Curated annotation (Swiss-Prot):
Glycans are attached at residue 70. Mn(2+) binds at residues 109, 111, 116, 155. This is Germin-like protein subfamily 2 member 3. Transmembrane segments: none annotated. May play a role in plant defense. Probably has no oxalate oxidase activity even if the active site is conserved. Gene3D superfamilies: Jelly Rolls. GO terms for cellular component: apoplast. InterPro entries: Cupin_1 (IPR006045), Germin (IPR001929), RmlC-like_jellyroll (IPR014710), RmlC_Cupin_sf (IPR011051). Its main location: secreted. SMART domains: Cupin_1. GO terms for molecular function: manganese ion binding. Residues 1-22 form the signal peptide. Disulfide bonds join 31-46.
Length: 219
């Protein structure tokens, strides 16, 4: 009986694979996100096309540098993703501006849903990412340079200079998502047990508690 089911299972898998590859392109001109709708199915539902306006495709927030004075890391990220530009819904792209104070850092983090390419607007940065084998790929980049961070790999940008710096970052996702290493591990809600982190990092529990004190849990 089990043997007789194999051809049926194989046929089902082939049909499913074909379905997964079908209609990969958009089936309408656009699908402006209806941010007021609580329903989410791997994205936002479409806004009524009759109610779409030019403002749905427009964002002015990247025109000027963001304030970095209140950032403990000396950096500020201004995102233009689907939550700020509803017209990006289903388009698979977004953009951000990152500003760095002198000595500023965009700490080690990853984007689980996107690769990233940065274009240096001003200044000089030390940037890099870690491969899954632990190799550091890093370089100093200058104004006008481009550097790429592969999807879901840990990466960072540091401004080691005495002048501000800024970049534009492009993503192949309308909502890349961001996980910063420090806050994710030491500021989770509910918290990761101290003994677990102590063993993972080869540290004593009091040291873990001290580090956690620097990362208040997100509400």
């Amino acid at each position: 009986m089990a043997t007789s089911m194999i051809p049926i299972f194989v046929t089902f898998m082939l049909v499913a694979a074909h379905m997964a590859l079908a209609d990969t392109n958009m089936l309408q001109d656009f699908c402006v996100a209806d941010l007021s709708n609580g329903l989410k199915v791997n994205g936002y539902p479409c806004k009524d096309p009759a109610k779409v306006t030019p403002e749905d495709f427009y964002f002015i927030g990247l025109a000027t540098a963001a304030a970095t004075a209140n950032s403990s890391m000396g950096s500020a990220v201004t995102g233009a993703n689907v939550e700020k530009v509803p017209g990006l819904n289903t388009l698979g792209v977004s953009i951000s501006r990152i500003d760095y104070a002198p000595g500023g850092l965009n700490p080690p983090h990853l984007h689980p849903r996107a690769s990233e390419a940065i274009f240096v607007l001003e200044g000089r940065l030390f940037v890099g990412f870690l491969t899954t084998t632990g190799k550091l790929i890093s370089k100093h980049v200058n104004k006008g340079d481009v550097f790429v961070f592969p999807k879901a790999l840990l990466h960072f940008q540091q401004n080691p200079n005495k002048a501000p710096a800024s970049v534009l970052a492009a993503f192949d996702s309308q909502l890349p998502g961001t996980q910063v290493v420090g806050p994710s591990l030491f500021g989770s809600n509910p918290p990761i047990p101290d003994d677990l982190l102590a063993k993972a990092f080869g540290a004593a529990a009091p040291e873990i508690q001290k580090i956690k004190g620097k990362f208040p849990p997100k509400k």
